[in-house]
Amino acid sequence: VSAVGDGNHSLATAKTCWNEIKKTLTPEEAAVHPARYALVEVVNLHDDSLKFEPIHRVVFGADAAKMTVALAGFFKDIFIAPKPPKDIAGRQVFVMLSNGNKQYVSVTDEKSNLTVGSLQAFLDEYLKKETGTVDYIHGDEVVERLCKNPENIGFLLPTPAKDELFKTVVLDGALPRKTFSMGHAQDKRFYLEGRKIR
């Protein structure tokens, strides 16, 4: 099975750039222009060198008490406590951070096959009604630092299992935005350095 992932909007950006450049070219120039092609990397999903990393969420300008009440209303079978549940079988578990407090949130009435999808469904609904903006953050330490501010609420997500990827696409369709990252953020400088094509 082959799959195409559009990480960091790479393919969408490449297509948009190409369509803009193409307008300035003759058909002969367009036929041989390097921007016509997207650089891709073919990898084996199960290769040990390919590491999945979670992409966490931080909601800026939010109220922790309102967020907790909203979580309890959105998920019907929910457990929120300062310690992780002893038995997590059949549960999706993530961590909520606010003002130095850590709460473990576990649910059984998941909205997606992946924990990140269930949380994203909640955040999408919550932010339709309440104030705040969400950002997608790499690294536990960064989330913990941001959530020392009492107006920020962070959600630490588990690393998605590789064997859940295709199953989730079958069950849920498209993956939620920013589901996972392949590698650590500090190792991905090439995204910034490899953008310019003339």
Residue ranges of predicted features:
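Surface-exposed, charge/polar-rich loops and edge strands
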Residues: 1-198
